[in-house]
């Protein structure tokens, strides 16, 4: 068996959580391979909404194994809050969830450092969520991090050394903070973490593959936030692309199967950074309100704009996408005209490749216009019900992108999902 990968192709918030939940019945194992609690995956079903920040989105499908991989950074305190909220809703996840011993821990001082670093940038802020993600990955790369497996042996000494190093940095930055309110509940959450099965996830996942079990790898954020290939420096601190699945779970590239790329029928971005198709007018505001475009973790309002096919083709190339999934089609139900950016104009020249640097002043999107469908799609159950104009939009996108759109989402609920090209 091979590992199928599901990841975002834009600037995050594409709807990965919902799709993982929909696809999970076809898999034995769901494994999260990177990121931390800075982004939430939202799922809606049976009249309830759930937001997962660290726990894989396959947790709601009974009997499925869910793994937090080594590429994830884990905040024990936020993890406990998340797990206890699920337990209060009737989901005891201790039998289903395993956690890699090699996943790195977000310390209380990581969160303070994150906030201090952002404050020091002044007007040059990149829009971090302040959850400690960047400093945790910094410690990981500099070989100073604490891992989940460390809590089993001599943890207090390792923690004290890391804390002392962080406090020296904070003193040098002249940043005030109060550790007392953060440290006690964090250590209590560490004890809670020990209730879960802590594993050598790379061995376990490869054993599942040898046994013929099917595995779905779940990514967080989106390709355009990748530390290497995103719109740097306005990016996250991990590899959000398909290659991150190999390093974040410990699997061979030869074991990667289908790559599902998720995108919205339009574009959004939260925080700072370039966004060529951003709409700062009534159209963008309508997209925001109709799409409920507010961060599931931070509550921040997302910037909205038309779909960007230059960026989308770039993301598909890097990830080797074999199947596309289009989300939030229903948000565009009310528009008379739908626009799609097919090229950029930079310095008077037409550009089809996503460039090294994109800025608002240098990059002008060139659009193709298509007629809107002006039809409520939220109650549709089959692609046979799609209006002609929507089918034309799908055909246009498939021709431009060269990959079939296998799934179309027409609403936030699990049931508002239409599978195309059934095999």
Tell me what each language-model feature is.
Residues 1-423:
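Non-transmembrane, aqueous-exposed alpha-helical and coiled segments at domain scale
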């Amino acid at each position: 068996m091979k590992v199928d990968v599901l990841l975002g192709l834009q600037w995050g918030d594409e709807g990965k959580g919902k799709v993982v939940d929909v696809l999970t019945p076809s898999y034995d194992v769901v494994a999260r391979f990177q990121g931390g609690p800075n982004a939430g995956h939202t799922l809606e079903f049976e009249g309830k909404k759930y937001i997962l920040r660290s726990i894989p989105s396959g947790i709601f499908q009974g009997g499925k194994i869910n793994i937090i991989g080594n590429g994830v950074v884990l905040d024990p305190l936020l993890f406990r809050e998340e797990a206890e909220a699920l337990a209060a809703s009737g989901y005891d996840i201790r039998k289903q969830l395993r956690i890699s011993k090699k996943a790195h821990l977000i310390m209380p001082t990581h969160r303070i450092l994150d906030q201090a670093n952002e404050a020091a940038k002044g007007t040059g802020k990149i829009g971090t969520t302040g959850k400690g993600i960047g400093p945790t990955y910094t410690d990981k790369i500099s070989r100073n991090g604490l891992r989940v497996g460390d809590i089993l042996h001599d943890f207090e000494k390792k923690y004290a050394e890391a804390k002392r190093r962080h406090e020296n940095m904070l003193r040098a930055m002249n940043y005030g903070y109060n550790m007392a309110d953060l440290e006690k509940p964090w250590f209590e959450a560490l004890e809670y973490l020990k209730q879960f099965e802590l594993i050598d996830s790379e061995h376990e996942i490869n054993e599942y593959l040898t046994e013929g079990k099917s595995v779905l790898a779940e990514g967080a954020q989106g390709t355009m936030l990748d530390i290497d290939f995103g719109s740097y420096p306005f990016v996250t601190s991990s590899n959000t692309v398909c290659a991150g699945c190999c390093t974040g779970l410990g699997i061979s590239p030869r074991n990667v199967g289908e790559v599902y790329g998720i995108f919205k029928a339009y574009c959004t971005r939260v925080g700072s950074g370039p966004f060529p198709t951003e709409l700062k007018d009534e159209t963008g505001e309508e997209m925001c309100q109709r799409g409920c475009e507010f961060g599931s973790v931070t509550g921040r309002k997302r910037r909205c704009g038309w779909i960007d096919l230059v960026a989308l083709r770039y993301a598909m190339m890097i990830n080797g996408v074999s199947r596309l999934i289009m989300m939030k089609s229903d948000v565009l139900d009310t528009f008379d005209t739908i626009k799609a950016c097919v090229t950029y104009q930079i310095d008077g020249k037409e550009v089809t490749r996503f460039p090294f640097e994109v800025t608002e002043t240098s990059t002008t999107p060139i659009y193709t216009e298509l007629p809107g469908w002006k039809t409520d799609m939220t109650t549709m159950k089959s692609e046979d019900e799609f209006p002609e104009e929507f089918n034309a939009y799908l055909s246009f996108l498939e021709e431009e992108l060269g990959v079939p759109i296998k799934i179309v989402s027409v609403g936030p609920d699990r049931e508002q999902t239409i599978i195309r090209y059934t095999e």
